[in-house]
Amino acid sequence: MLFEGLDLVSALATLAACLVSVTLLLAVSQQLWQLRWAATRDKSCKLPIPKGSMGFPLIGETGHWLLQGSGFQSSRREKYGNVFKTHLLGRPLIRVTGAENVRKILMGEHHLVSTEWPRSTRMLLGPNTVSNSIGDIHRNKRKVFSKIFSHEALESYLPKIQLVIQDTLRAWSSHPEAINVYQEAQKLTFRMAIRVLLGFSIPEEDLGHLFEVYQQFVDNVFSLPVDLPFSGYRRGIQARQILQKGLEKAIREKLQCTQGKDYLDALDLLIESSKEHGKEMTMQELKDGTLELIFAAYATTASASTSLIMQLLKHPTVLEKLRDELRAHGILHSGGCPCEGTLRLDTLSGLRYLDCVIKEVMRLFTPISGGYRTVLQTFELDGFQIPKGWSVMYSIRDTHDTAPVFKDVNVFDPDRFSQARSEDKDGRFHYLPFGGGVRTCLGKHLAKLFLKVLAVELASTSRFELATRTFPRITLVPVLHPVDGLSVKFFGLDSNQNEILPETEAMLSATV
């Protein structure tokens, strides 16, 4: 018994020694990791590097970021201030909040900073994209792509977008159970990108498979760039390969069949604009370009669409005020009419309250956290040095949350953007849902157009109610969205705002 007791004590002592050793090893390695990055400060600059933590060796604070969501940024901003250092997705990073700080970064493109997304994002989107290009190449690509989002182009997309949204809402209303809004919004924006923007005639079965693959691609765009079996990065690479193969097939079929088209889609305009600028696009450039267009139209717009529906659910007075505006303009149309082309750009631009609603959704629920840059030369920001070679992320969402020009920043209040109040008029960098400077989002007008049409159709043709007791928690990765997707039951409305019976709804769906 004595020896057995000694064996137990010995085992516990050994275990305790191991735990102490591991703890000490982690503490020492973490301290060395901090010193490793502290040594990269620019010795010629007397200012200190921003405060913050670099986390653990190699992984940094990526785990904390993924688990804490919005709490990660807010807790560190509270502890370290508007400019702090961290280590995310395999690289050192300085996160920046505040209009003046963000302005310096956005206006410093090409001489202080240059765009650089995380390595996983760069590799998965491809080298031929607008977002990954710099300097003259970036300027030339923006000129080519700008034709896709011109006023004339948006006017030609509008009837098709409206019809896709009408069909989708009709399907949601005819569904006997509640739907997952975020998942369905992703399908809607994906369908819009494929059918309307790119003009691809992909069979429904193939489109469903392509959507699943694209979902896998998007889920891993922001992942640790570690190419190992079963890693998120490897899954993203595999999804990209499948997508590229499917896109090449669709592009070749589209180029061979040009008959019977009643409008020029984005891919047509991209090819045409490229030729106008003296360049013939290669197949690889076309594949990367279409992949980027889908990415731009898909994830962020689905996020904003879900946020729009959630806020209309939370604030019925906003929805009713929106309906009043539509009635005043004579466009609160019948839910039983699938007519295409009843909206025009000038009509939408005249809906002032609708514009305020969309702006407030984008202020309070900006789909992406911010943008990434790499530092070309050391500069000063908020009393700290931002060393050459480091990465910087300017925070859109936190800049909105801390902007002094907005009263009651956490309250959903569309009237803050009304002509009477115009809280966004003081300082252009307090409100920047689409970024700013030379890299302002090219597709921002298309995104706002889509959201406005969706809001008009929701107010005109649908009643909807939350199918759960409480509203879900919000997560931020890869874009802002409800953790459960937002479960909502939809009901169709007729021209008198009366609920359409399920049998009638089914008959209407069958005629489309």
Curated annotation (Swiss-Prot):
Classification lineage: Eukaryota, Metazoa, Chordata, Craniata, Vertebrata
Name of this chain's protein: Cytochrome P450 26B1
Broad class of enzyme this protein falls into: oxidoreductase
Localisation per UniProt entry: Endoplasmic reticulum membrane; Microsome membrane
Family to which the UniProt record says this protein belongs: Belongs to the cytochrome P450 family.
Induction info: By retinoic acid.
GO cellular component: cytoplasm; endoplasmic reticulum membrane
Noted disease: Radiohumeral fusions with other skeletal and craniofacial anomalies: A disease characterized by craniofacial malformations, occipital encephalocele, radiohumeral fusions, oligodactyly, advanced osseous maturation, and calvarial mineralization defects.
Binding residue positions for heme: C441
The protein's required cofactors: heme
Protein encoded by which gene: CYP26B1
Tissues in which the protein is found: Highly expressed in brain, particularly in the cerebellum and pons.
Catalyzed reaction equations: all-trans-retinoate + reduced [NADPH--hemoprotein reductase] + O2 = all-trans-4-hydroxyretinoate + oxidized [NADPH--hemoprotein reductase] + H2O + H(+); all-trans-retinoate + reduced [NADPH--hemoprotein reductase] + O2 = all-trans-18-hydroxyretinoate + oxidized [NADPH--hemoprotein reductase] + H2O + H(+)
One Pfam family linked to the record: p450
EC number: 1.14.13.-
GO MF terms, alphabetically ordered: all-trans retinoic acid 18-hydroxylase activity; heme binding; iron ion binding; monooxygenase activity; oxidoreductase activity, acting on paired donors, with incorporation or reduction of molecular oxygen, NAD(P)H as one donor, and incorporation of one atom of oxygen; retinoic acid 4-hydroxylase activity; retinoic acid binding
GO BP of this protein: bone morphogenesis; cell fate determination; cellular response to retinoic acid; central nervous system development; cornification; embryonic limb morphogenesis; establishment of skin barrier; establishment of T cell polarity
Role, per record: A cytochrome P450 monooxygenase involved in the metabolism of retinoates (RAs), the active metabolites of vitamin A, and critical signaling molecules in animals. RAs exist as at least four different isomers: all-trans-RA (atRA), 9-cis-RA, 13-cis-RA, and 9,13-dicis-RA, where atRA is considered to be the biologically active isomer, although 9-cis-RA and 13-cis-RA also have activity. Also has a significant activity in oxidation of tazarotenic acid and may therefore metabolize that xenobiotic in vivo.
UniProt keyword annotations, A-Z: Craniosynostosis, Disease variant, Endoplasmic reticulum, Heme, Iron, Lipid metabolism, Membrane, Metal-binding, Microsome, Monooxygenase, Oxidoreductase
Protein topology in the membrane: Peripheral membrane protein
PANTHER family: CYTOCHROME P450 26 (PTHR24286), CYTOCHROME P450 26B1 (PTHR24286:SF177)
